[in-house]
Swiss-Prot record:
Cited Gene3D superfamilies: Cobalt-precorrin-4 Transmethylase, Domain 1, Methyltransferase, Cobalt-precorrin-4 Transmethylase, Domain 2
Subcellular location: Cytoplasm
Name of the protein described by the UniProt record: Ribosomal RNA small subunit methyltransferase I
Coiled-coil region: none
Residue ranges crossing the lipid bilayer per the database entry: none
Keywords: Cytoplasm, Methyltransferase, rRNA processing, S-adenosyl-L-methionine, Transferase
Enzyme Commission number, as recorded: 2.1.1.198
Catalytic activity: cytidine(1402) in 16S rRNA + S-adenosyl-L-methionine = 2'-O-methylcytidine(1402) in 16S rRNA + S-adenosyl-L-homocysteine + H(+)
Database matches in PROSITE patterns: RSMI
Primary residence: cytoplasm
Gene that specifies this protein: rsmI
Stored InterPro entries: 4pyrrol_Mease, 4pyrrol_Methylase_sf, 4pyrrole_Mease_sub1, 4pyrrole_Mease_sub2, rRNA_ssu_MeTfrase_I, RsmI_HTH, SAM_MeTrfase_RsmI_CS
Span of the signal peptide: none
GO molecular function: rRNA (cytosine-2'-O-)-methyltransferase activity
Length: 273
């Protein structure tokens, strides 16, 4: 019986090709096959480094059906790599279902660390990095996005979001409206690329800068927002505790309204706590 292979989770550059580590290059050269989010994109990356390996497209629409097939190959002794289009796989990218299935099957899963847009942005933001929460992409629909931001408005930890270029302006508008125009934030754009910019200031200032400069609405974005003041977070925590008790005896809307009146916390922030 053959020894099972290894699934390597390989981080790839988010812009600057020089950020692909020597170890990552070695792994990509030696595995049997590379599972890639977009094989066309990954093929270009491999060509730059003179690497030729079979590729298998693994994305959000087929991961659940392909996982079993990939696990079978790993069990047979093949070692495979998983990459995303940019950065570390699984971080707002496919791969979770495969990694979970591999671990359940007793396959060794090992990280090959490297670039990550959220960590790169946080490291240069000047905002507290000892405690933070990563929210990925906010909902595309305005109502759902605002509801999510309302729930996060009193989060005391530094908040990190990804955002697309066609939504960056309206996202900053919603952030300023819901979090408060004076909340400090950072907008990091095109990190490690030629047109990299890192803007900082109040949400109101950033909203204006991005709205008035078309170039600042192009590319890939990481938004980092200062956490809420401790007293605001304490209100939310207490409000959610009281809401949980009250909703056992009252309709959710009535329980939230009463808990908000008792604690001074925003009513909408108490749902789902």
């Amino acid at each position: 019986m053959s020894t099972p292979g290894t699934l390597h989770i390989v981080a790839t550059p988010i812009g600057n090709l020089g950020d692909l580590s020597p170890r990552a290059q070695h792994i990509l050269r030696t595995v049997t096959m590379i599972c890639a989010e977009d094989t066309r994109h990954t093929r270009q990356l491999l060509a730059h480094f003179g690497i030729e390996r079979p590729l298998l497209a693994l994305h959000a629409h087929n991961e659940d059906t392909l996982a079993e097939r990939i696990i079978t190959r790993l069990i047979s002794g093949e070692s495979l790599a998983l990459v995303s289009d940019a950065g570390t796989p699984l971080i707002s990218d496919p791969g979770f279902l495969l990694v979970r299935a591999a671990r359940a099957a007793g396959i060794r899963v090992t990280p090959v660390p490297g670039p990550s847009a959220l960590i790169a942005a946080l490291s240069v933001s000047g905002l507290p990095s000892n405690r933070f929460t990563f929210e990925g992409f906010l909902p595309a629909k305005p109502t759902a996005r605002r509801d999510r931001l309302t729930h996060l408005a009193h989060e005391p930890r530094t908040l990190i979001f990804y955002e697309a270029s066609h939504r960056i302006a309206e996202c900053l508008t919603d952030l300023a409206t819901i979090f408060g125009s004076m909340r400090i934030a950072v907008v990091a754009r095109e990190l490690t690329k030629i047109f990299e910019t890192v803007l900082d200031g109040t949400l109101a200032t950033l909203q204006t800068q991005v709205a008035n400069d078309e170039n600042q609405r192009k590319g890939e974005f990481v938004i980092i927002v200062q956490g809420a003041a401790d007293q605001d977070a304490a209100k939310i925590t207490e409000g959610r505790r009281i809401y949980a008790l009250l909703k056992e005896h009252l309709p959710p809307s009535s329980a939230a309204k009463l808990a908000a009146e008792i604690t001074g916390a925003p009513r909408k922030a108490l749902y789902g706590g």
